[in-house]
């Protein structure tokens, strides 16, 4: 086991581990640390704790110091400079006629580098733009092309549920989502209905996946034959996954009757689950395209 603290450098960004070097650092404090990008000002989201060695990427870098009021002031000034940098970079993009959309600007704490994040449909030759920006800011310039998921994470928005987007509110990292999750939850497989603001499969499909997998594993399939505790045998006509109720079609004399049972009142042989949805080729291709476009955040490189 090794003692670490967890630090973020962006809101809802990835959490990185650092060595507290014996300091009693608490959640909510700010620290100065050295990263691959240089000296950075970070927000402590996980106080001192022990984690397993295999959870830590070695060598574990130490905390340089707990942030001072002067450090806080420098960070606040950097935030102001980032707004001005965005405006200047947008002007330069227009000047060079580049087909790219600027999303965010970021100063490193030591002011040795300015990073600009942008989206574009293809590759962009921005070499002349970098030279132009370097002559203005007199520091190292880095332009980084990001995807639509990163763009949405930065800008935020409201989902179809009426709540702030998960990626902008609390998700530290993008989680893999798949068509299978939508099927498991009995959702419409219309790409429009299960896509987020970014145009990719909604992150929230992952939230209830395990619950639905467990609940579905306890139920028979529609069309299966089951035995009931009251001595009847019938065909499953429908299931209610969340309430764990099953409607069974039972023959009573010359008539057929639909009765509802709790899943615990039925006996059946579990078998490999079948695909429960019929999707046309066009919709399936669209869904598979969305699934292929899932990727890791470019902010974490």
Which stretches of residues belong to each language-model region?
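Short beta-strand segments
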Residues: 14-16, 40-42, 232-234, 256-261
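Intrinsically disordered, low-complexity linker and terminal regions at domain boundaries
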Residues: 258-301
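Short, basic/aromatic beta-hairpin or loop at an interaction surface
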Residues: 1-15, 194-207, 253-254
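Acidic-enriched and Gly/Ser
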Residues: 1-191
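Conserved glycine-centered short motifs in functionally critical loops
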Residues: 157, 161-227, 234-237
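Basic/aromatic-rich interaction segments and small domains that mediate binding to polyanionic partners
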Residues: 240-260
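A generic structural signal for residues embedded in beta-strands
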Residues: 33, 227-229
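A short, compositionally biased micro-patch
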Residues: 10, 136, 229, 239-241
């Amino acid at each position: 086991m090794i003692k670490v603290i967890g630090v973020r450098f962006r809101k809802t960004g990835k959490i990185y581990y650092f060595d507290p070097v014996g300091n009693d650092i608490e959640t909510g404090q700010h620290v100065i640390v050295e990263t691959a990008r240089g000296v950075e000002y970070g927000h402590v989201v996980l106080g001192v704790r022990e984690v397993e060695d295999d959870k830590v990427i070695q060598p574990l870098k130490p905390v340089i110091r707990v942030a001072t009021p002067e450090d806080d002031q420098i960070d606040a000034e950097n935030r102001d400079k980032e707004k001005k940098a965005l405006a200047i970079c947008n002007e330069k993009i227009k000047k060079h006629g580049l087909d790219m959309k600027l999303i965010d600007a970021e100063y490193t704490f030591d002011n040795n580098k300015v990073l600009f994040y942008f989206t574009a449909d293809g590759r962009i030759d921005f070499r002349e733009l970098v030279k132009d920006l370097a002559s203005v800011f007199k520091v190292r310039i880095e332009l980084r092309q990001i995807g639509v998921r990163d763009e949405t994470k930065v800008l935020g928005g409201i989902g179809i549920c009426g709540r702030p987007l998960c990626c902008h509110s609390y998700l530290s990292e993008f989680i893999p989502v798949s068509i299978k999750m939508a099927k498991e939850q009995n959702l419409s497989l219309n790409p429009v209905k299960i896509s987020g603001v970014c145009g990719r499969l909604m992150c929230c499909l992952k939230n209830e996946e395990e619950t639905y997998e467990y609940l579905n594993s306890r139920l028979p399939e529609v069309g299966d034959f089951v035995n009931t505790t009251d001595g009847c045998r019938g065909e499953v006509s429908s299931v209610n996954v969340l309430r764990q109720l099953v409607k069974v079609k039972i023959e009573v004399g010359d008539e057929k009757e639909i009765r509802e049972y709790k899943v615990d009142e039925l006996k059946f042989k579990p078998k490999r689950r079948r695909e429960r949805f019929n999707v046309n080729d066009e919709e399936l291709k669209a869904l598979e395209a969305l699934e292929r476009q899932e990727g890791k955040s470019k902010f974490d490189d």
